[in-house]
Amino acid sequence: MDVNTGNVLAMASYPSFDPNWFINGLTPEQVDYLMKSDEAAETTPARNKAISMKLAPGSIFKMCTGFAGLMEGVVGIDETIDDESPYYVKDPETGEAIMQNPVKCWTKYPQRHNNQTIIEALKNSCNYYFCEVANRLGIDKLADWAKKLGLANRTEIELTGEAQGTIGGQQDLYDTGKLQAWVKQPVRG
């Protein structure tokens, strides 16, 4: 996407198909390929997955988490956070881990990112740093900032089938499946 105009410069969806198939009519095999059964509807080649699938944003959401943390004052621009990977999500009442698989940074143990500022954490895409910022914010403030930044809205791109964003909140906090899928940076009690 062109950051100045919002114009789409490139887009891909896989599996793909050859649009020339439609010139002389589709064979039964091509129809079957394009219109997979309902249980595989999300992966049908006829669907533009780049704009229609609702997927966890992954590391791109770290910018939202960091911005929200700075705006709410829970992290300073020059403050460092030590990567003590892995990041365990804990029940605030019991202190027990509520996730069997703690969030790990992409670096391999024993390597870690050590003390980092937000700029270094973005550069290194450090999961631990943004888990800690998300924890300091709380899930509802993080969700509010995601909404303020327009992540719950359609982009109004001139292509049909665009899905609207979905943002979780406190009610999703202890559904660990939703929590992991929501931001890939869960909060810790």
Language-model-derived ranges and their functions:
Residues 4-59, 64-189:
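Beta-lactam-recognizing serine transpeptidase/beta-lactamase-like catalytic domain environment
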